[in-house]
A protein has these predicted regions:
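Gly/Pro- and small hydrophobic-enriched strand-loop and loop-to-helix capping segments
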Residues: 106, 229-246
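Conserved alpha/beta-domain cores
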Residues: 1-221, 225-227, 239
Length: 246
């Protein structure tokens, strides 16, 4: 594990160099975005190494794995405090496992799911089990790929007002994924489309404040940062020794 920790530290320096260079190219300050280490493919030991290497913000795509990581890390009180987000598809029967455990849910892709999260959160707030509304991002299928979930741009335009009124959630922004296997130009267009949609929604709904844009992964995070992403979700480039850092 010592060799893995050394790799993690060296890899983090390389990632941050690229991260800050992308922000510089866009004329954005270095604190304009945050790096999320997606730990969904690794165990608790690897996550501990990532924390020791300097990462403080993590994400999981399955509720049971989120709970497992939090339970495992609780056995390491010597580590600094970290936060976990939920980024994967969330089924309604798993909502209670995520509420209060995930700082931010990135993947609210339907009005039905938003309503379900809100109603469960309200009950937990009333029972004293949750401090306040659950922070969420709305997943938007900007690219229009049939294989991807989320609101279409037209659907989120129609639902934005209702989402803003749900008492148990606080909508913080939007999330999307770029098309699979496409060239960088297409990825940049998807990320720019998310930013433009956010600006449009804020203009149409003054009660909506959407500071967060979650987009960009291991292969395309630099393009995302150049187009305004505030949260990049990096898995393989952080954790996989085999991933080629360009």
């Amino acid at each position: 594990m010592d060799n893995y920790l050394d790799l993690m530290r060296a890899r983090r320096e390389q990632i941050l160099e690229r991260f800050y260079a992308a922000l510089d190219r866009a004329g954005r300050p270095h604190d304009a975005a945050r790096l999320i280490a997606v730990s969904k493919t690794v165990g608790v030991d690897e996550t501990v190494a990532a924390i020791q290497a300097g990462y403080r913000h993590f994400a999981e795509n399955r509720p049971q794995e989120l709970v497992r990581k939090l339970t495992g890390l609780a056995e390491h009180p010597e580590l600094p405090e970290v936060r976990f987000d939920m980024i994967g598809n969330l089924q309604t029967n798993k909502i209670n496992a995520v509420l209060g455990s995930a700082e931010l849910i990135h993947s609210v892709g339907s009005l039905h799911l938003a309503q379900a999260i809100s109603s469960r959160a309200v009950r937990k707030i009333e029972a004293g089990e949750l401090v306040g509304p659950q922070r969420v991002l709305i997943e938007v299928n900007v690219s229009g790929e049939e294989s991807k979930g989320g609101f279409s741009p037209d659907e989120i335009r129609a639902a934005a007002g209702e989402l803003a009124e749900l008492e148990g959630i606080c909508v913080q922004g939007l999330m999307t994924m770029a098309p699979r296997g496409q060239v960088r130009m297409w990825h940049a267009g998807t990320f720019a489309g998310l930013r433009e949609l956010r600006d449009e929604l804020e203009a149409a709904h003054p009660d909506l404040n959407l500071p967060e844009l979650s987009c960009g992964m291991s292969e395309d995070f630099e393009s995302a940062l150049e187009e305004g992403s505030t949260l990049v979700r990096l898995g393989r480039v952080v954790f996989s020794p085999e991933f080629a850092v360009k």
